[in-house]
Amino acid sequence: MKIFRILFLPIITVTLISSCKKDKSNDPIPKASNTPVIELVSVTPTTVHALQDSIVFTIKYTDGDGDLGFAEADSMVVFLTDNRFPIVNPFHVQPLSPLGTTISITGNLEIILNNTILKDNASTSESAVFEIKLRDRANNYSNVLTTPAITVLP
């Protein structure tokens, strides 16, 4: 019986000590930045006819404090610029999390650009590249995405 205690007690002690190690897999997810971060998911189609087809840009967003979107329809969130023109196309987005909360959010946004035009009406085709950025309610601007070229046909 004494041998059993001598062998059993150290085994139990080692087991208890090793089970007290912090399990890093249960650590909370690191907090995302309060500045929005965006990634390009897709752009479709890659060829459009001027004044006929729409272009759909799908972007993934992450925002650490969840303040993307405005209740007021005249406050813009998404800014889309065609490299052929010095014009910014702004888009409104409703709040993506409840107002007054501070939660980390992530998701996808679809931005639809209707009726792309040709810069030169005599052109047989043009290549358009777009830049996209977001603005949150704290006036933080995201990184800027640059899309692959889209062919615009007459």
Question: Model-found features: residue ranges?
Answer:
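Small/flexible residues
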Residues: 7, 23-24, 86
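Bacterial Sec-dependent N-terminal signal peptides
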Residues: 14-38
